[in-house]
A protein has these predicted regions:
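Amphipathic alpha-helical segments in well-ordered regions
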Residues: 49-61, 86, 126, 130, ...
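Amphipathic alpha-helical segments enriched in hydrophobic/aromatic residues interleaved with Lys/Arg
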Residues: 6-64, 68, 81
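Short, basic, alpha-helical segments at the C-terminal edge of helix-turn-helix-like DNA-binding modules
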Residues: 65-67, 123-132, 161, 170-172
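N-terminal positioning helix adjacent to the helix-turn-helix/winged-helix DNA-binding module
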Residues: 25, 29, 71-79, 115, ...
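Glycine- and acidic-residue-biased ligand/ion/polar-headgroup-sensing regions
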Residues: 1
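Terminal helix-turn-helix DNA-binding modules in bacterial transcription factors
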Residues: 80-81, 85, 90-95, 102, ...
Length: 172
């Protein structure tokens, strides 16, 4: 299924009447996506931001379509369980979608509607929570970072600072 069909539920390309748009919320997705691509960071985060950005552009500026986001409570809970069980591994959006039985677009929209955060943010919250426990138990920050699924200590420190407002070194 192509992305447009996943987002709109229709097998037709959306039309866009505006060539240039000024939308602060679009920039909020575009800027982190650009940073992730330029720094070669997390594929999951890049894919999620790209899909959310494209979905937003189609919904706001494409031809109108029904914006029906299914509840999918059971599927969302399956996605949460998958992330809770596999947080220390490199996780891809495709894996979560297969496990939950939802398309990428449906998972992103329904998950965000249900949980108030994107799947990637949910995963990062789990990882930070587990890393906090490890730091409290005396693990060095680099070990906590690697055991909780962060690719390196720098990535871990940035997320930890953002979520906890302290560096892992000060926290421990």
């Amino acid at each position: 299924m192509d992305l447009t069909e996943e987002v709109t539920g229709k097998r037709e390309l959306p039309g866009f009447s505006e060539n240039v748009i000024f939308d602060e919320e679009v920039i909020c997705y575009l800027h982190p996506l650009h940073e992730m691509v330029m720094k070669g960071l997390c594929d999951f985060g890049k894919e999620e931001n790209l899909l959310l950005l494209i979905s937003m552009l189609i919904q706001r500026y494409g031809q109108p379509f029904e914006n029906c986001i299914p509840e999918c409570r059971g599927e969302i809970e399956k996605a949460c369980r998958f992330m809770e069980q596999h947080f220390a591994e490199r996780i891809y959006l495709d894996q979560i979608c297969r496990y939950a039985g939802l398309s990428k677009s449906t998972l992103l929209r329904a998950f965000t509607k249900s949980k108030g955060v994107t799947p990637y943010s949910y995963l990062e919250n789990i990882r930070i929570g587990e890393a906090k426990k490890m730091l409290e138990q005396g693990f060095p920050p680099i070990e906590a970072a690697l055991r909780t699924g962060f690719s390196d200590q720098s990535h871990f420190t940035n997320y930890f600072n953002r979520f906890i407002s302290l560096s892992p070194f000060l926290f421990s």
